Structures are given as C-alpha cells and as structure tokens.
Amino acid sequence: MADYSTKAVWVGGHRGELKCSNGAVVPFSAPAELHGEADVLTPEDAFVGSLNSCFMLMFIWAVERLKIDLESYECEAVGSVQEYLDRTSTFSEITMSPKIVARDCSERDIQRALELAEKYSLIWQSITAEVTLSPEIKILK
C-alpha cells in the first residue's frame, strides 16, 4: 500500500504553502471571493485538477499500452458545487471534456483507452461526486 503525505503551512492571511512528499511546494489560497487571492491555487481547483491530471496520466498510460499514435490531448474539467441550507457544500458533479487527436486507429480504440483511464484513475475511483465524460475524438489518417 502506498502512502502520500502533504503538510499545509499557514503563511498569513488566507494563504498557505502545501509541502508535498515528493518535494514540491505549492502556494495556495482561499478563492478570491472568499477573502483569498487571485492567481493562486485554491483547494477547489486542486480537487478538480487532481481528477483531471490523474485521468490524463492514466489515459496516456492506456494509449501507450494499446499502441495508439496520440497526436494531442487536452481536457477541461468543470466541478459543480451543490450548496445546502446549512451553508455546507459538496462537489456534486465533475464534467470532463477531453479533446483527443490520434492517428491510424479507430474511435473504439480511443474509447477503450478512456475506459481504462477511468478504471485505473485512483482519484476517479476515490471521489463520490458524479463524473461525466464527454470526449471529442478526431482520428487522422
């Protein structure tokens, strides 16, 4: 079993630094509308971004395994927050919209790589929000 650790250190105001077990140090803040600062990673962006980046890495792994000639990949992920009467909130849905360009393969090959990426994405398998995948696939000959 693998363990991952981080350390959050307050640096003043509504800012902090996230020190990761791999040595990365990432500044973060509350969202600007919640007394935070603009242009700094927020916990909400990190949550959606962790799914997006993990899914992409697993997709790349699947593409390599299936020997797909990938030309490009980019994915926009949007997390929708549900707010409740008691002022609590949760991510209720995350929509993933990958744009994939590949060469000399079938759309079914890409769909299989997407299925494998979903199955083996640690973050996808760990969250309770509904995840919707809406890929745009282009095959070049």
Feature locations, PLM:
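Alpha-helical metal-binding/catalytic segments enriched in His/Glu/Asp
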Residues: C54
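Active-site-adjacent loop/helix segments that line or gate small-molecule/cofactor pockets in enzymes
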Residues: L57
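Extended beta-strand/beta-hairpin segments
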Residues: M1-G49, I60-K141
